Amino acid sequence: DLRYDRADEFVEIVLGHWDSWQDDALIVDKSTNLFADPSKVSRLDHKGKYFSSRGPFTVPRSEQGHPVLIQAGQSGRGQRFAAQWAELVFVGYPNLEFGTKAYASLKAQAVEIGRDPGSMRIAHLIAPVVAATKAEAEDKRAELEKLPIEEDSLMLLSEALNFDFASKPMDEALSDEDLASMSGLQTFRDNVIAGSGKSNPSIRDFVEITQRGRLSRPVVGGPKEVADYMEEYFTTPACDGFVIAATYVPGTYEDFVKFVVPELQRRGLFHNDYEGKTLRENLGVR
């Protein structure tokens, strides 16, 4: 919770700096040597619990007002932080039922805070394995599942949780002290404890449940199957859009554009052109 308490204050300061320039503050008049209207540039003098910061910011406001605030974190405190500040929330749902409830909950939390739920977009992570046909995609998946090695999983888990997963035997139960020392993506730890049904899961439990370094919950199929999956999540709704994870490089994004995008466009679910010049415009974030 301390990390998020600090983050709350940090974001408040950053937004204060970005908003210290009004949209029409710039004059840029060489004849008068006037760069900006001083009445439209305000001073920030923040002295808080964790940070002190003084403004105004040293650069003018950007064309999109300020960069889009993107957040990832699905713990209870992380969701409250997202509801308060995030304009794009990065999520990874295990299934549609969970996603539908989580989506509604996060939007409701934003409303409770006084935000327009349309000012926050939620993007669900998918790992597509796509080909011209479902059979070809299944063959591709079979080949991909031969590739992971145990050392990669341990390395990625160690990175995510700041714990040396190579320091213990794979099937030895981790101690309470081991589990308490894990930091970083603590949702991983909590999900493993819940998913394994053990208060002291083993390292193998972490590998099997988190699927780090492996093909985790892939969406496998031809254009129709992958588009069906995305359409169901989008229209239920369980998300406002998607983050496409690369399951193989090179090739994932090329195959997705070749096979899936035309099908989504045919269904009227994906744009044929861009909404504007900025990320904010293209996300539809107000």
Regions from the PLM with identified roles:
Residues D1-P56:
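Active-site region of glycoside hydrolase catalytic domains
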Residues D1-L15, D19, F57-R286:
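C-terminal amphipathic alpha-helical "assembly" element
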